[in-house]
Amino acid sequence: MKKIYRFFAVMALLLVTMTSKAQNDLALTLLPNFSYCNMYNPAIPVGSRTVIGLGISNINFSVLNTGVNYDNLFTFHNDGSVALDANKFVNSLDEHDNIIGTNFSMDVFRVGKRIGRLFIDLNYRVKFDAGLHYSRDFLGFFVNGNGNYLGKDNPANLSVGADFSLYSEMALGLQYRINDKLSIGVRPKLLVGFANLSVNNDGTKIYTDENTYSMTADVNLNISAATALDMDDISRLSDFTTYIEDMDTLIIENLFDIEENIGYGIDFGVSYTFNKHFGVAAGVYDLGYITWKDTKVKQNCKENMVINDALFNSMDDVLNMNIDFTDVYETLVDDVWGNDSIYNGGDYKTSLKTRIMLQGYYELCPLARFTAISQLYYVKEKFRPSLTLAYSGSILRLLNFTASYTMSEYSGNSVGAGLGINLGPLNVYVVTDNVMIATKYNASTMELLTSYDNANIRLGMVLTLGNRDKKKK
């Protein structure tokens, strides 16, 4: 078997087990009478005159998994027994385009104020965003062994890439109401990168001799890393072990450090209300990049590299998520990459995951609003479409609710729901874009995290003062 992609297989599994972005997390913007209606389009009018959020105003955990599906991992017999079905699993994967993504975000503070026709919205947010993509052969080689890849003309094409980013976002939203029907909005952002790891391993091929079954590999691995912390003491790959263990202090110690790893982003949009029943909006969200400095770079480009060790000793470790990342990392360094020197690299850029959105709504009455949202989401160098249909309503502006159905090319179909309560100036909400995940609360870790392509929860409390519509009257 092989050891060259041990690290990437573990990272794929770790991504699923981490505190985790359902890529269609729209439920929050669908809740009536809530100030986050303009989260993805700064032109959508905010009903409140003043908005205040501190710490827990907007917290999001989510995960995307388009490849590892629980029903495709196992065969379920009539007697209730379950058996791992390796061939079924591998054949269910896309040849090249399998994605795992995870996200955590939290608004540290938010202050918004309406002054005449202008609404000013200042927001500071911390984000962790990670994505990994891999080919069918990447897991097929591990599951089925090298017997399926015999001969010079039949290599295992192992394609894997990863991008992990921890950064902050300071955004200034400006929304201007041109008239009673038309509003425009723009939200420039200052981005500060805390840490990034970018891995590109699209050129690795594993060859198995059809007579001797000996294996060789052509490896083309490129890794770039950067952080806001001092990396002067990091000169070898093994030095990252201690660095990773101290990562939990990164946000606290460098929360407002803006000396390096600077980036810029922007959201912009337009909204138009035809009458009290119909409205449309269009916008672009998260168009931008971060430039990473003080980088460390590792490259491994080898041909005919002999490999002969296994990826994992036991499949039980995979199924039970019993994986020690530090041990795997150290083994990888010693046996595959070699604990040789890494060197200082040049600046590099990573892009935000941009969305292009078009939406329209019909409101029969406050108790019945129907919305359609079409979006293109930039994932793995492709714009991927999705469509969300939603119902939302409000009872006396006190109880607000929404239900939605999303159809997505890359994250599957899902049913979302949300509930918000306005207790005077205090607004409390909880939303999800996949309510079905709640049916797996008592399931095993593997079943919980692989039963659906995406899952998320977003919750928070925010203070709002004044009602724009009442003031107009």
Label each residue range with its predicted role.
Residues 23-473:
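Subset of outer-membrane beta-barrel
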